[in-house]
Amino acid sequence: MARHIIILVAVFWFATAEASHCSINGLPLVRNISELPQENYGRSGLSHTTIAGSVLHGMKEIEVWLQTFAPGFRTPIHRHSCEEIFIVLKGQGTLYLTPSSHSKYPGNPQEFHIFPNSTFHIPVNDVHQVWNTGEQEDLQVLDVISRPPVKVFMYDDWSMPHTAAKLKFPYYWDEECYQTTSRKDEL
């Protein structure tokens, strides 16, 4: 009997280890995104799930996120050396964007209203911020980035010099797994 329990515990432990959230081992090929856990990574008002990613899933060219912003939540003012595409699933908000330029700081951003079924892209190194300006409803987006994992430069405000922006790498949702994942840059 004790031997059966030990075998059962060993099988359970192996299956759990194989399905680690820092690995694709044990994950089904087809998954329901509404059943994937979302976390806020210490950022109240944000729920994030990496649907397919570099650090978590071994993706090399793109990364896909599902993000939900509570009313009033906003991303930091930031830029990154990758392209980014958003698809708004629900809610409304505002995109603030300053095109990449040769000035020393971002300057006054352009404002764009975003809404369900709208899409927008952020060019490489354009400083931007997404804000749920709705009062009642969450803003939910699918977010696709190129060249993962993302290296984010954050600004305190729109007048902060580019050279003073603070690098955040690995980013919040990559921190735990980035340390445990060996990165190979070949096919």
From Swiss-Prot:
Record key words, sorted: Auxin signaling pathway, Disulfide bond, Endoplasmic reticulum, Glycoprotein, Metal-binding, Receptor, Signal, Zinc
Record-annotated disulphide pairs: C22-C177
Entry GO MF terms: auxin binding; zinc ion binding
Coiled coil: none
Signal peptide segment: 1-20
GO term, biological process aspect, one: positive regulation of cell division
Placement of sequence motif Prevents secretion from ER: 184-187
GO cellular component, one term: endoplasmic reticulum lumen
InterPro entries xrefs: Auxin-bd, RmlC-like_jellyroll, RmlC_Cupin_sf
Binding positions for Zn(2+) per the UniProt entry: H78, H80, E84, H128
Pfam families for the chain: Auxin_BP
Subcellular location: Endoplasmic reticulum lumen
Residues with attached carbohydrate: N117
Description of how the protein assembles with itself and partners: Homodimer.
Biological role: This is probably a receptor for the plant hormone auxin.
Stated name of the protein: Auxin-binding protein T92
Top-level taxonomy: Eukaryota, Viridiplantae, Streptophyta, Embryophyta, Tracheophyta
Gene giving rise to this polypeptide: T92
